[in-house]
């Protein structure tokens, strides 16, 4: 399974009352599929999966699937710190005809490497849906070691990893130990270019909500051997990469999308809105990069109607 180069970790839109805004989710998915995203990761970290019910997630999977209509891969965030839950959710995603599943390292219960291997192996054996492993120790409290990744890469349906430890030594060791068919995606926009130099395939991106086409050009420039051009793209986008993590993700990206006219709403509690000082910095970066020049989403539709 080739998921592509730019996979957008899609936000989950909410109404003012905090309910799922499925209509806006469909509009956003449609937009992303035509603006640089090869795939959409639905209900991952950026999609606020810890605050969603499984029924909300399943309906969102269906809505996004229908909205992109085959123009982009749809990868379901069906990971859990309960192996049984992860299996059940992954089977449901497969029944819905999605293209893959994102399987986060189990959080809170801090399993050993042996436990992590058995967890992912059980999911892989329960469904034919291709698996994108997700290593993010800063959030889970446990790290999937390169040797364990290499073991898992021997399983037919374990095809890739979203490596978000932020450590290039870890990515290097994963690349050294796994076959070339096993894809490594950066879990941080700012590390996309460095990871490409280590044999990475692309990025699971937050910034691609705003600059998907530019991220594609960064990656394609590198692949074409135009490394100076790729670096120029990276440096131009770098302030955006950093400001989108000025506070806990996905709070800044949702604020940025709201500024553009998307009705994605606030993050659900316990995540709080951006502090005024952070909001000011975010707006300044977006204005400097010309990302607030035209309205998008529901606001754009309202303007056209009027």
Curated annotation (Swiss-Prot):
PROSITE patterns given in the database record = DHDPS_1, DHDPS_2
Residues the UniProt record annotates as site (Part of a proton relay during catalysis): 45, 108
Give the catalytic activity. Answer: L-aspartate 4-semialdehyde + pyruvate = (2S,4S)-4-hydroxy-2,3,4,5-tetrahydrodipicolinate + H2O + H(+)
Name of the featured protein: 4-hydroxy-tetrahydrodipicolinate synthase
Pfam families in alphabetical order: DHDPS (PF00701)
Q: Which gene encodes it?
A: dapA
Q: Where does pyruvate bind?
A: 46, 204
The pathway that the record names for this protein is: Amino-acid biosynthesis; L-lysine biosynthesis via DAP pathway; (S)-tetrahydrodipicolinate from L-aspartate: step 3/4
User: What EC number(s) are associated with this protein in UniProt?
Assistant: 4.3.3.7
Give its localization.
Cytoplasm
Which protein family is named in the record? Belongs to the DapA family.
């Amino acid at each position: 399974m080739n998921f592509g180069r730019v996979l957008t970790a899609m936000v989950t839109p909410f109404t003012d009352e905090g309910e799922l805004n499925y209509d806006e989710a469909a509009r956003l998915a449609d937009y992303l599929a035509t603006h640089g995203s090869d795939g959409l990761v639905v209900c991952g970290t950026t999609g606020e999966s810890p605050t969603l019910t499984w029924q909300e997630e399943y309906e969102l999977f269906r809505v996004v699937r229908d909205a992109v209509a085959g123009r982009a891969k749809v990868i379901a965030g069906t990971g859990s710190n309960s192996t049984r839950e992860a299996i059940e959710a992954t089977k449901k995603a497969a029944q819905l005809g999605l293209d893959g599943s994102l399987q986060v390292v189990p959080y809170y219960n801090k399993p050993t490497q042996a436990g992590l291997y058995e967890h992912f192996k059980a999911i892989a054996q329960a469904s034919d849906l291709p698996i994108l492993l997700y290593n993010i120790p800063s959030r889970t409290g446990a790290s999937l070691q390169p040797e364990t990744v290499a073991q898992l890469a021997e399983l037919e349906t374990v095809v890739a990893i979203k490596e978000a430890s932020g450590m290039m030594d870890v990515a290097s060791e994963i690349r050294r130990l796994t076959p070339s068919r096993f894809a490594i995606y950066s879990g941080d926009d700012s590390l996309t270019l460095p990871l490409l130099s280590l044999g990475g395939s692309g990025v699971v991106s937050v910034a691609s909500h705003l600059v998907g086409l530019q991220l594609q050009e960064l990656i394609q420039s590198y692949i074409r051997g135009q490394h100076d051009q790729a670096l120029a793209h990276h440096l131009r986008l770098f302030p955006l990469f950093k400001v989108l993590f000025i506070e806990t993700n996905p709070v800044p990206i949702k604020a940025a999308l709201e500024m553009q006219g998307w009705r994605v709403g606030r993050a659900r509690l316990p995540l709080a809105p951006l502090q005024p000082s952070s909001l000011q910095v975010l707006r300044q970066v977006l204005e400097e990069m010309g990302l607030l020049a035209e309205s998008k989403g529901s606001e754009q539709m309202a303007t056209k109607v009027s």
